[in-house]
């Protein structure tokens, strides 16, 4: 017998004699899976083991990546969760919270996956993802003009259901992307092209059902007004899991009117600089039924401007308003398209009228995935023509970045900044979204696009809000600050930018409802004990 064979035999005999108590401990994912399976109460009609995906599950990566909306995080390098719980029952949420706390795992809550910097499905330490896509019911009461919508429902599903149930005479003020999940979109504010008429989504939310850090199911009455205040604009993921929202539906006319006018540079009779300057004068002051978004981009060293609008009424009334307030744009009858409000959802996606059925907004998986970076700003004073020319020059040198100017005013200026946790109200003319998209992998391309975004962002600093330089929570931007140790000092860096003076109230509420800071992530609200 050779020496190697003898050694192998000895090792084998030794291993066979080891007591079972010395066997390898179960993996963390096994312990978590067992913990949630043993949790009581449970729903025998929806056993949680049918909704748990660990890294050994054959479709783990499919479930994880189905709601990754930024290809920057769609790779083998990002840390993967210990498990994904695709909750289909409230007991699944309670079990996930209880077991994550017990095992010291961080929790990431994902409804639509549109967190621009991936904070709903990424972490630097062991974590689990609570995926809400199975919880998507929408119960509409047409008599009361209200609806209960679960967090996993998309805006497209909500819009489609509301329009069908109301004979196209009701809508809801929220985002223009139908794939957004209600959970995160609403809790960060929820803005869209009816905000000048009706405010944000949170201004039309009248109740919520949540699961708190103790696993309790609460509504507005039992959670208290302070927590309900925080959920509306403060980012619910810092406080609880939102199971469902009760929304107030709003009237929409039988027909709305949309248009999109594009200009290129300053050539001939077209002067983009003058048009943008005039847009600044009127966009936040014009009729509340009219929303005109201005998007600026550049190609071939020429700035392009897009004036995309929606009027809650017919084209004749729209033209009267435009001829009186913005004749320089030159909007004419044939450029105005009348359609149902539900059809306008597709128009804002860039889909030509009549080329796709409204059911297409029910598609949950986008046809095209992209790499992206987003940032935000608020403008409170008009940018001078000299300033605009300077900005245009920088844009021609950084052509991978666009800016969308979204006008405020109207209802947005009437609601006090302390009415909800969302503080950006009166005094803001418009909000800017910086957007860089790219379509090929590689570090060099990503670095170039990120650098271009940062250069434009820095160049805009003289023209935007200051002390703090305000930011919009739903345009998640890790560059403005993050908390690695969950301290107040770290949290206030980004907290005052997102929430201004409302940040201090959010910290107090957080400290009361989640003193152990279970619900935390890189930009969560800190607790006072960390002060």
Curated annotation (Swiss-Prot):
Pfam families: BBE (PF08031), FAD_binding_4 (PF01565). Residues 77-252 form the FAD-binding PCMH-type domain. Its cofactor is FAD. Binds 1 FAD per subunit in a bicovalent manner. Its EC number is 1.1.1.-. There is a cross-link at residues 114-177 (6-(S-cysteinyl)-8alpha-(pros-histidyl)-FAD (His-Cys)). It comes from the Eukaryota. Accumulates in cell walls of etiolated hypocotyls. Glycans are attached at residues 76, 164, 271, 300, 314, 400, 485. GO terms for molecular function: FAD binding; oxidoreductase activity. The FAD cofactor is bound via a bicovalent 6-S-cysteinyl, 8alpha-N1-histidyl FAD linkage. One of its GO terms (cellular component) is extracellular region. Disulfide bonds join 35-99. Residues 1-23 form the signal peptide. InterPro entries: BBE, FAD-bd_PCMH, FAD-bd_PCMH-like_sf, FAD-bd_PCMH_sub1, FAD-bd_PCMH_sub2, Oxid_FAD_bind_N. It is an enzyme of class 1 (oxidoreductase). The keyword Amino-acid biosynthesis does not apply. Belongs to the oxygen-dependent FAD-linked oxidoreductase family. This is Berberine bridge enzyme-like 9.
